[in-house]
Amino acid sequence: MSDALKHECAVAMVRLRKDLSYYKSKYGIENYGLSRLILLLEKQHNRGQDGAGIAALHLHPEPGRPAYQRVRSAADNPLADVLQQVGDGAEFHSELLLGHLRYATFGRYDVSCCYPFVHESTQLGRMLLLAGNFNLTTNTEMYERFLESGHHPASHADGYLLLQTIAHYLDREESRTPGMVNLSGVLRAALQPLDGAFTL
């Protein structure tokens, strides 16, 4: 990649494919996934100074325990603030981690605009965490499509609208084929009408 790094959002994801005990045994690190995610975010730190967030999705949570943990910050030094909130990382000991550094081109400078965004559900197959870099030109059309379909969107922000669009198709697919969601089909349907630049 020869392009100069500019001020843009950064997205990082870690997916551990083996049991968590394997990484502790091999590397001697209790929370290997979180340490890798932090390293990826620190390496991209120049890309986002307006906000930061980290989420850990537990693929097999015990009943009665949350399926994910998330911290976000819009403090003066957001990544350092997020890492302080994470502390020893015990709650973030997980197989799937998602991080984001925000460079605000639109929207407010506030924690509600910081990714990862979450679409809540008590059904694990319908829960969605999203982080990305969005500059969509079809926000108005997406917003109007939501209104016409009986939804009540709480924001015009492109990230929010995209989260709700993906969640709509995910819910529909999960209802049609419970436990056997075709995620590539869900994303294809949700992203098809988009125009602009984005990274998920």
Predicted segments, located by residue:
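Conserved short alpha-helical segments that host acidic/polar catalytic motifs at enzyme active sites
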Residues: M1-L200
